[in-house]
Amino acid sequence: MKGNNTIFKQTLLLILFCIGSNTVSAQQTFTNPILDYGADPYSTYHNGYYYYTHTMQNHLVLLKTKNLADLKNAEKKIIWTAPKNTDYSAEIWAPEFHFINDKWYVYFAADNGSNNTHRMYVLENNSKNPMEGEWIFKGKIAAQTDKWAIDGNVFIYKKQLYMIWAGWEGDTNGQQNIYIAKMKNPTEIDGDRVRISSPTNPWELHGALHDDVNPPQVNVNEGPQFLSHKNKVFIVFSASGCWTDYYSLGLLTFTGKDNLLDPLAWVKSDKPILEQSHKTKVYAPGHNSFFKSPNGKEDWILYHANSNPGEGCGVKRSPRMQQIRWDKKGNPVIGDPISEGFPLAIPSM
């Protein structure tokens, strides 16, 4: 019996060791995609937690986790549902949560059911915990011209609050540009907008449409995201139509001194910094955001992409993440989109 007990104990210890090893392994690595679906992924880090969201069409959802690679097990809450029959009841796109001056804000684009009416809106929450408190609708946020607008991103540069977004120059669809403006406060734009990017390069001009609702061709710059590294300032944006496999990320580099509203100070990359890869079987990567690892030492990118060619702008888009490197000149290097199922180390704790 003693021999049998010894064998039993050794076997049990081996099983427990294997289980423990697998648990540790699962905690230390992850694979893309990090969720089965989710377009326009955005995350912000605050007080030891990541707060994540993505486009949900008619409501806003917030996920809370210490590890973005474990989003499937994150705490989840619907924090706001659009009321019916308003200018902002439908097509809620690209929400972003920001903690500014001890308050939480969520910026999003929405319309009344017709894409031509898309504008940006903002909610405010006085609670230090965005999963609690009351989210109050503060209204539309627009420049003086008040044209079609989506994909708002806010940031602070040298103590000044700015907003960047995608919009139309006039009142008809056909081309989306990137605009920037100063903000008076987190709910108001100060003055008018300045255009800093338009689709001009061949890789930005994949936008043919084949339906009766839209123009035959729409050229796209959208989804701008602020990025800084040491003393350099960038805006990463999405180019070409999301309905094409050529949806990709481009880079604007600020070459001026202090005036971010100088359009001549923004220089565009000659080619995408992230694009589809037949080699890794990832298609239409775009509409990204950035985050740092919990220890603050690593820079990471979140983006959505499709697993197969021709899947377009639908529910097949899923969020992925991978680490950013920096070249000797201080420019971001992303590389190819990582293959699905390829194990990656989680962001350093």
Locations of regions flagged by a protein language model:
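Bacterial Sec-dependent N-terminal signal peptides
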Residues: 1-28
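Carbohydrate-active catalytic/glycan-binding domains of CAZyme proteins
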Residues: 26-349
